[in-house]
Amino acid sequence: MKRLFLIALIILLAAMGGILIIQRTQVDTDVTAQTTKVGIFTNGEFMDRSWGQTHYEALESLKEELNLEIIYKEHAPGDCYADIKELIEKKGCRIIIGCSFDYGKAMQKAAAEYPHTYFLHAGGVYHQENYSSFFGRMYQARYLSGIVAGKKTKTGELGFIAAFPNSQVIRGINAFTLGVKSVRPDAVVHVSYCKSWTDDAPALNSCLKLLDNFPIDVVAVHTNSMAPHQEADSRGVWSVGYHRDNRDLFPNTYLVACVWDWQIYYREQILNCLQGKFHGRQDWIDKEKGMVSLSPSPHLDMDTAILVREASEKFNSRGFDVFYGPIKDNQGQLRINAGESMSDDEMLNGFDWYVEGVTVED
């Protein structure tokens, strides 16, 4: 049994780029001779074992190499212009990083006012000469996690606790559902919105609403809160993590996680800033570049690991993507024709509908 698990784990690691490649970048010591101040802010905390911590760990890993002084600001509001102004004028930051979708308008305003400061917006949708928005194709990892969840469910009913119904979140819900239905066509994904990215109480309430009313045996999340995982664990319900691998907290019920690694991107962009090569743009990073991946898991059987590997290889070969038609919405309307696919712009900004199999319970 142990041998089969090890083989399945190796297959999964290979599929998701988990075979570690140490990438040594020759850093121009002239541009890193002086300390560069980087200001980064988020709507939660940086040691949250979730979204905030993934950014913290990436920047800390680069601090010595790139000679950075990093100023962390937690619980920044959506209207964070005053915080940005303080980081630039009082703290002397040359690079500003915002870690919430909600910061778009404030960062746009600041970027226009401070043209010699560089802005990086995680999960944003705007860009200008000194301002880039960036994200990874996390929907691909979501699809793969859906395969894992679809193979694990016995009831065919799964839950999804999500923060807000914007295009980014709905894209993830839809991708997860399509992954589930690729192996369990009769499955239903019940969605509850907790209306918060970070708060435990509403995330727990959404989880309770789903688990108390439906025979759900797997839950997935798009929230930074650990509360849904804790509740699922207390009931013996499987959970699918997001942002960071937290299987050490829930070893018996944490099925798999869709995780971020920002290190390569931050190194590249900070060096571009220091070398005068930065040009603002919308960056949407492919899975094979290492920004998004699926965590290893001791709870996968061989068949599931092979299915994940095969789907991942299709992504890497560009022979398949999640939103290739035909795809119907949950009202029965054909949204994507056979032989067609959604454009990047449609996927980034146009998701206001759900695929077949999703029911929103709010």
Question: Where are the regions that the model predicts?
Answer:
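Positively charged n-region of N-terminal signal peptides that target proteins for export
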Residues: M1-L4
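Hydrophobic membrane-insertion alpha-helices, especially the h-region
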Residues: I7-L20
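A residue-level marker of the well-folded mature domains of exported/periplasmic proteins
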Residues: L20-D362
